[in-house]
């Protein structure tokens, strides 16, 4: 299939708007400039639209196998495409866990059969993600593992993490860490702070996260391993990562949209759609995350898309599962709250969602260039709409942003040269 995207505008390296047409042939961008349509290609009229590299999210939970009531690879991929994402990386906290070559091959086949976007599967660090026995990294890499993580739980012993880092470094793969010391959770369901004290809830202290990061950056230095911090959430964690980068340690970090947008003081009542892990932290933590993203301490934005059923979330705060969905709302929320008000440039936001995650992990995506993968998102920066969870393509409706009005919405997504999502008014 061939497409010609006409009349749109792109951002150049300086963040300036430039009008350009883009030709897609097969899975590849084959021309950029002022182009005329040929008889054998489909024209997409992008007049008034930003033509962006497809978004990249290196932290999603698609729940399959074992959690299909919450999400599947197919429904998660559709949600990603609607949100403008063309590449996502799926976490391994499924049942069963992708901890063997055979299970990883099953996941890869399922992706090929059902996904409309590129899905990169993580493999687990430990068997069944219970932290006491290492998986076969070499076999899992051969089966297509993107990187290694036990996301959902932290690796509790330094010895296990150090061994994992040495094995990962030997095969040029990253260790991706959910940073949480179980001895410091204290049965908490929210941040230890204003909200927990006001509502009589056990709180999770900031040091629960930062102490693991402090341990792990030293282990990563010793192992010469690429160490990536998931969903960083505290000012202390930002400080540790900043210092580690200054020391030349191979550490990268991501931050979620919800930690950039909300803090614990924003939680209304006991709404479990505001319960995620790590929890919403203090206003000071939120400010440190924004500063860390802007100064390069934090490398990119990832949603930590974590769908649950409404039945699971419809309970008291201490019993509800952690997690919210984010793929279909990330760009409009961030554009509205940071770009529209002048805090960030449009190019900064686009980079945090495209080239930056690719640079962090050496992926050949995230740009609009001739010869590169045809991963393209068309965005209507003038479109205003209210977030409505009932329109989500994800099975998960667990969002704290339902009813929020946002400007700037993806309206079409091309993933590897195939039209993965469109609103129905663009193709001629």
UniProtKB/Swiss-Prot annotation:
Residues involved in Zn(2+) 1 binding: 59, 61, 151, 304
Q: Per UniProt, which keywords does this protein have?
A: Hydrolase, Metal-binding, Pyrimidine biosynthesis, Zinc
Q: Give the domain of life.
A: Bacteria
Its annotated pathway reads:
Pyrimidine metabolism; UMP biosynthesis via de novo pathway; (S)-dihydroorotate from bicarbonate: step 3/3
Class of the enzyme per the UniProt entry, highest EC level: hydrolase
Cofactor: how and how many bound? Binds 2 Zn(2+) ions per subunit.
Q: Which CDD domains match?
A: DHOase_IIa (cd01317)
Which example biological process does GO assign this protein?
Answer: purine nucleobase catabolic process
So where does substrate get bound?
61-63, 93, 277, 308, 322-323
**Cysteine disulfide partners in this protein:** none
In this chain, Zn(2+) 2 is annotated as bound at 151, 178, 231
Cofactor(s), names only, from the UniProt record: Zn(2+)
User: Which InterPro entries does this entry report, sorted A to Z?
Assistant: Amidohydro-rel, DHOase, DHOase/Allantoinase_Hydrolase, Dihydroorotase_CS, Metal-dep_hydrolase_composite, Metal_Hydrolase
Instruction: Give the annotated active site.
Output: 304
A molecular function (GO) term: allantoinase activity
Give the signal peptide, or none: none
Please list the reactions this protein catalyses.
Answer: (S)-dihydroorotate + H2O = N-carbamoyl-L-aspartate + H(+)
**E.C. number(s) listed in UniProt:** 3.5.2.3
User: What's a GO cellular component annotated to this UniProt protein?
Assistant: cytoplasm
Q: Which Pfam families match?
A: Amidohydro_1
Q: How does it assemble?
A: Homodimer.
| PANTHER family per record | ALLANTOINASE (PTHR43668:SF2)
Which family is this sequence assigned to? Belongs to the metallo-dependent hydrolases superfamily. DHOase family. Class I DHOase subfamily.
- What job does the chain carry out? Catalyzes the reversible cyclization of carbamoyl aspartate to dihydroorotate.
Q: What is this protein called?
A: Dihydroorotase
């Amino acid at each position: 299939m061939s497409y010609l995207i006409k009349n749109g505008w792109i951002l150049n390296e300086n963040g300036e708007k430039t009008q350009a047409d883009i030709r897609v042939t097969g899975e590849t961008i084959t021309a950029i400039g002022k182009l005329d349509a040929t008889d054998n290609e489909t024209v997409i009229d992008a007049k008034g639209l930003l033509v962006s590299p497809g978004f990249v999210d290196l932290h999603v939970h698609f729940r399959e196998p074992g959690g299909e009531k919450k999400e599947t690879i197919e429904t998660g991929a559709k949600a990603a495409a609607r949100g403008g994402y063309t590449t996502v990386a799926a976490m391994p906290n499924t049942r069963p866990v992708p901890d063997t070559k055979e299970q990883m091959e099953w996941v890869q086949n399922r992706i090929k059969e059902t996904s409309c976007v590129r899905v990169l599967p993580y493999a687990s660090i430990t068997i069944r993600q219970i932290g006491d026995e290492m998986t076969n990294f070499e076999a899992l890499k051969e089966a297509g593992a993107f990187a290694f993580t036990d996301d959902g739980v932290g690796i509790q012993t330094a010895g296990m993490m150090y061994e994992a880092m040495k094995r990962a470094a030997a095969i040029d793969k990253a260790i991706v860490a959910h940073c949480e010391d179980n001895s410091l959770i204290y049965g908490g369901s929210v941040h230890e702070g204003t909200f927990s004290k006001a509502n009589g809830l056990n709180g999770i202290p900031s040091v629960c996260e930062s102490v693991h990061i402090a341990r792990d950056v030293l282990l990563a230095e010793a192992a010469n391993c690429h160490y990536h911090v998931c969903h960083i959430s505290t000012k202390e964690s930002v400080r540790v990562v900043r210092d580690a980068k200054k020391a030349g340690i191979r550490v990268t970090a991501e931050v979620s949209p919800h930690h950039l947008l909300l803090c614990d003081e924003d939680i209304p009542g006991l709404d479990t759609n505001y319960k995620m892990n790590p929890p919403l932290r203090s206003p000071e933590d939120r400010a440190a995350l924004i500063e860390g993203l802007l100064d390069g301490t934090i490398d990119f934005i990832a949603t930590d898309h974590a769908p649950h059923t409404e039945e699971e979330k419809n309970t008291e705060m201490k019993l509800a599962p952690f997690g919210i969905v984010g793929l279909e709302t990330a760009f409009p929320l961030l554009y509205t709250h940071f770009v529209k008000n002048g805090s960030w440039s449009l190019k900064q936001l686009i980079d945090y969602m495209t080239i930056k995650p690719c640079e962090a992990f050496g992926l050949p995506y995230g740009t609009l260039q001739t010869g590169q993968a045809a991963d393209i998102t068309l965005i209507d920066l003038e479109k205003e709409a209210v977030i409505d969870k009932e329109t989500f393509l994800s099975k998960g409706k667990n969002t704290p942003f339902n009813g929020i009005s946002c400007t700037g919405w993806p309206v079409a997504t091309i993933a590897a040269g195939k039209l993965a999502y469109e609103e129905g008014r663009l193709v001629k």
